[in-house]
Protein backbone atom coordinates (compact mmCIF):
# COMPACT_ATOMS: atom_id res chain seq x y z
CA UNK A 1 0.00 0.00 0.00
CA UNK A 2 1.21 3.51 -0.73
CA UNK A 3 -0.92 4.82 2.18
CA UNK A 4 -1.94 2.75 5.20
CA UNK A 5 -4.32 4.31 7.72
CA UNK A 6 -5.16 2.60 10.99
CA UNK A 7 -7.76 3.46 13.65
CA UNK A 8 -8.07 7.14 12.76
CA UNK A 9 -9.94 9.31 15.25
CA UNK A 10 -10.63 13.03 14.92
CA UNK A 11 -13.06 15.24 16.84
CA UNK A 12 -13.83 18.93 16.72
CA UNK A 13 -14.96 19.90 20.19
CA UNK A 14 -17.43 17.25 21.30
CA UNK A 15 -18.20 16.25 17.73
CA UNK A 16 -16.42 13.08 16.54
CA UNK A 17 -15.79 13.39 12.79
CA UNK A 18 -13.66 10.28 12.20
CA UNK A 19 -14.26 7.18 14.29
CA UNK A 20 -11.83 4.27 14.06
CA UNK A 21 -11.25 4.55 10.30
CA UNK A 22 -8.79 2.11 8.71
CA UNK A 23 -7.96 1.63 5.03
CA UNK A 24 -5.14 0.89 2.61
CA UNK A 25 -4.65 2.82 -0.63
CA UNK A 26 -2.62 1.20 -3.41
CA UNK A 27 -0.50 2.61 -6.26
CA UNK A 28 -2.46 3.25 -9.44
CA UNK A 29 -5.84 3.29 -7.72
CA UNK A 30 -8.49 5.94 -8.24
CA UNK A 31 -10.53 6.03 -5.02
CA UNK A 32 -13.77 7.97 -4.66
CA UNK A 33 -14.66 8.98 -1.09
CA UNK A 34 -18.41 9.48 -0.79
CA UNK A 35 -20.97 10.09 1.94
CA UNK A 36 -23.49 12.64 3.20
CA UNK A 37 -22.43 16.12 4.27
CA UNK A 38 -20.77 15.89 7.67
CA UNK A 39 -19.80 12.23 7.25
CA UNK A 40 -16.07 12.98 7.47
CA UNK A 41 -15.04 12.85 3.79
CA UNK A 42 -12.90 15.99 3.67
CA UNK A 43 -11.56 15.36 7.17
CA UNK A 44 -10.38 11.92 6.03
CA UNK A 45 -8.65 13.47 3.01
CA UNK A 46 -7.00 16.06 5.26
CA UNK A 47 -5.90 13.35 7.70
CA UNK A 48 -4.37 11.14 5.00
CA UNK A 49 -2.48 14.09 3.50
CA UNK A 50 -1.21 15.45 6.82
CA UNK A 51 -3.15 18.72 6.64
CA UNK A 52 -4.64 18.09 10.09
CA UNK A 53 -3.36 16.38 13.21
CA UNK A 54 -5.26 13.31 14.38
CA UNK A 55 -6.49 12.67 17.91
CA UNK A 56 -5.44 9.03 17.55
CA UNK A 57 -4.39 6.56 14.89
CA UNK A 58 -1.61 6.27 12.34
CA UNK A 59 -1.03 7.15 8.68
CA UNK A 60 1.94 5.56 6.92
CA UNK A 61 3.04 6.90 3.53
CA UNK A 62 5.27 4.59 1.52
CA UNK A 63 6.92 7.12 -0.77
CA UNK A 64 9.92 7.10 -3.08
CA UNK A 65 12.32 7.76 -0.21
CA UNK A 66 10.86 5.17 2.15
CA UNK A 67 8.13 4.86 4.74
CA UNK A 68 6.97 7.98 6.57
CA UNK A 69 4.75 8.05 9.69
CA UNK A 70 2.74 11.14 8.77
CA UNK A 71 1.21 11.70 12.20
CA UNK A 72 4.65 11.86 13.85
CA UNK A 73 5.93 14.67 11.60
CA UNK A 74 6.25 18.27 12.73
CA UNK A 75 4.16 20.95 11.03
CA UNK A 76 7.17 21.97 8.94
CA UNK A 77 7.88 18.37 7.93
CA UNK A 78 4.25 17.80 6.94
CA UNK A 79 4.31 20.97 4.84
CA UNK A 80 7.44 19.68 3.09
CA UNK A 81 5.82 16.28 2.54
CA UNK A 82 2.79 17.89 0.90
CA UNK A 83 4.95 20.13 -1.30
CA UNK A 84 7.17 17.31 -2.52
CA UNK A 85 5.07 14.14 -2.50
CA UNK A 86 1.39 15.07 -2.79
CA UNK A 87 -0.72 16.90 -5.35
CA UNK A 88 -3.96 18.75 -4.56
CA UNK A 89 -6.96 19.78 -6.65
CA UNK A 90 -9.83 21.67 -5.00
CA UNK A 91 -13.34 22.63 -6.09
CA UNK A 92 -12.48 26.26 -6.78
CA UNK A 93 -8.92 25.60 -7.92
CA UNK A 94 -7.41 28.04 -5.39
CA UNK A 95 -5.33 29.61 -8.15
CA UNK A 96 -3.83 33.12 -8.05
CA UNK A 97 -6.15 35.18 -10.30
CA UNK A 98 -3.53 37.84 -11.11
CA UNK A 99 -1.08 35.25 -12.47
CA UNK A 100 -1.15 33.52 -15.84
CA UNK A 101 -1.74 29.80 -16.25
CA UNK A 102 1.97 29.18 -16.71
CA UNK A 103 2.89 31.34 -13.70
CA UNK A 104 0.42 29.52 -11.43
CA UNK A 105 1.89 26.14 -12.34
CA UNK A 106 5.51 27.34 -12.26
CA UNK A 107 5.00 28.86 -8.82
CA UNK A 108 3.99 25.47 -7.43
CA UNK A 109 7.05 23.87 -9.02
CA UNK A 110 9.38 26.49 -7.54
CA UNK A 111 7.82 26.04 -4.09
CA UNK A 112 8.73 22.35 -4.47
CA UNK A 113 12.34 23.42 -5.12
CA UNK A 114 12.49 23.35 -8.92
CA UNK A 115 14.67 26.10 -10.51
CA UNK A 116 12.68 28.77 -12.36
CA UNK A 117 13.60 27.87 -15.95
CA UNK A 118 13.02 24.18 -15.35
CA UNK A 119 9.73 25.02 -13.63
CA UNK A 120 8.59 26.98 -16.68
CA UNK A 121 9.49 24.08 -18.96
CA UNK A 122 7.62 21.56 -16.78
CA UNK A 123 4.62 23.89 -16.59
CA UNK A 124 4.44 24.39 -20.36
CA UNK A 125 4.67 20.64 -20.94
CA UNK A 126 1.88 19.85 -18.47
CA UNK A 127 -0.41 22.59 -19.79
CA UNK A 128 0.19 21.40 -23.35
CA UNK A 129 -0.76 17.85 -22.36
CA UNK A 130 -3.97 19.23 -20.85
CA UNK A 131 -4.91 21.11 -24.02
CA UNK A 132 -3.94 24.58 -22.79
CA UNK A 133 -0.84 25.12 -24.91
CA UNK A 134 -2.35 28.25 -26.46
CA UNK A 135 -3.32 29.72 -23.08
CA UNK A 136 -0.03 29.76 -21.16
CA UNK A 137 -0.08 33.56 -20.87
CA UNK A 138 -3.78 33.92 -20.09
CA UNK A 139 -4.70 35.10 -16.60
CA UNK A 140 -7.01 32.96 -14.50
CA UNK A 141 -9.79 35.57 -14.52
CA UNK A 142 -9.99 35.18 -18.30
CA UNK A 143 -10.53 31.41 -18.17
CA UNK A 144 -13.64 29.27 -17.87
CA UNK A 145 -14.17 27.01 -14.86
CA UNK A 146 -13.12 23.94 -16.80
CA UNK A 147 -9.97 25.62 -18.09
CA UNK A 148 -9.07 26.76 -14.58
CA UNK A 149 -9.46 23.21 -13.27
CA UNK A 150 -7.10 22.00 -15.99
CA UNK A 151 -4.55 24.51 -14.69
CA UNK A 152 -5.18 23.18 -11.17
CA UNK A 153 -4.56 19.62 -12.40
CA UNK A 154 -1.29 20.73 -14.04
CA UNK A 155 -0.25 22.47 -10.83
CA UNK A 156 -0.95 19.30 -8.82
CA UNK A 157 1.45 17.28 -11.00
CA UNK A 158 4.51 19.57 -11.13
CA UNK A 159 6.29 17.68 -8.35
CA UNK A 160 5.65 14.24 -9.90
CA UNK A 161 3.43 13.48 -6.92
CA UNK A 162 2.77 9.74 -6.43
CA UNK A 163 -0.53 10.64 -4.71
CA UNK A 164 -3.04 13.35 -5.64
CA UNK A 165 -5.89 14.41 -3.35
CA UNK A 166 -8.90 16.04 -5.03
CA UNK A 167 -11.73 17.60 -3.01
CA UNK A 168 -14.90 18.00 -5.12
CA UNK A 169 -12.81 18.82 -8.23
CA UNK A 170 -15.90 18.85 -10.47
CA UNK A 171 -18.38 20.32 -7.97
CA UNK A 172 -18.55 23.78 -9.58
CA UNK A 173 -18.67 22.54 -13.19
CA UNK A 174 -21.50 21.63 -15.56
CA UNK A 175 -21.88 17.91 -16.28
CA UNK A 176 -20.08 17.92 -19.64
CA UNK A 177 -17.09 19.86 -18.32
CA UNK A 178 -17.06 17.69 -15.19
CA UNK A 179 -16.72 14.56 -17.32
CA UNK A 180 -13.87 16.13 -19.27
CA UNK A 181 -12.03 17.18 -16.10
CA UNK A 182 -12.48 13.76 -14.51
CA UNK A 183 -11.18 12.06 -17.66
CA UNK A 184 -8.09 14.28 -17.53
CA UNK A 185 -7.50 13.47 -13.85
CA UNK A 186 -7.64 9.75 -14.64
CA UNK A 187 -5.36 10.14 -17.67
CA UNK A 188 -2.78 12.21 -15.80
CA UNK A 189 -2.73 10.20 -12.57
CA UNK A 190 -3.89 6.53 -12.22
CA UNK A 191 -3.28 5.74 -15.89
CA UNK A 192 0.34 6.81 -15.22
CA UNK A 193 0.55 4.40 -12.26
CA UNK A 194 -0.02 7.11 -9.65
CA UNK A 195 -2.77 7.29 -7.04
CA UNK A 196 -5.86 9.52 -7.01
CA UNK A 197 -8.20 10.09 -4.06
CA UNK A 198 -11.36 12.05 -4.84
CA UNK A 199 -13.92 13.41 -2.39
CA UNK A 200 -17.15 13.72 -4.34
CA UNK A 201 -20.95 13.85 -4.21
CA UNK A 202 -21.19 13.00 -7.91
CA UNK A 203 -22.07 9.36 -8.74
CA UNK A 204 -20.58 9.81 -12.22
CA UNK A 205 -17.24 10.75 -10.70
CA UNK A 206 -17.43 7.68 -8.46
CA UNK A 207 -18.32 5.52 -11.46
CA UNK A 208 -15.11 6.58 -13.18
CA UNK A 209 -12.99 5.45 -10.22
CA UNK A 210 -11.66 1.97 -9.58
CA UNK A 211 -12.87 1.95 -5.98
CA UNK A 212 -15.54 3.67 -3.90
CA UNK A 213 -15.29 4.19 -0.13
CA UNK A 214 -18.53 5.34 1.51
CA UNK A 215 -18.53 7.13 4.88
CA UNK A 216 -21.42 7.53 7.30
CA UNK A 217 -21.06 9.30 10.66
CA UNK A 218 -17.28 9.18 10.50
CA UNK A 219 -17.04 5.46 9.76
CA UNK A 220 -16.48 3.44 6.60
CA UNK A 221 -19.70 1.54 5.87
CA UNK A 222 -18.82 0.38 2.35
CA UNK A 223 -15.58 -0.18 0.42
CA UNK A 224 -16.16 -1.61 -3.05
CA UNK A 225 -14.09 -2.25 -6.16
CA UNK A 226 -15.56 -0.92 -9.38
CA UNK A 227 -14.85 -3.43 -12.15
CA UNK A 228 -16.37 -1.08 -14.73
CA UNK A 229 -14.67 2.15 -13.74
CA UNK A 230 -15.05 4.79 -16.41
CA UNK A 231 -18.46 3.52 -17.57
CA UNK A 232 -20.94 5.65 -15.58
CA UNK A 233 -24.09 4.13 -17.10
CA UNK A 234 -23.14 0.55 -16.20
CA UNK A 235 -21.86 0.52 -12.67
CA UNK A 236 -23.05 -0.30 -9.20
CA UNK A 237 -22.54 3.06 -7.55
CA UNK A 238 -25.52 5.20 -8.57
CA UNK A 239 -27.36 4.16 -5.41
CA UNK A 240 -24.45 5.20 -3.22
CA UNK A 241 -24.31 8.50 -5.03
CA UNK A 242 -28.04 9.04 -4.64
CA UNK A 243 -27.76 8.37 -0.91
CA UNK A 244 -24.90 10.85 -0.71
CA UNK A 245 -26.82 13.57 -2.52
CA UNK A 246 -29.96 12.92 -0.50
CA UNK A 247 -28.00 13.37 2.71
CA UNK A 248 -26.18 16.49 1.57
Give the positions of each predicted feature.
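Conserved signature/switch motifs of ABC ATPase nucleotide-binding domains
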Residues: 83, 138, 159
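The feature captures the beta-strand-to-loop junction immediately N-terminal to the Walker
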Residues: 34-36
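ABC ATPase NBD Q-loop/coupling interface
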Residues: 58-80
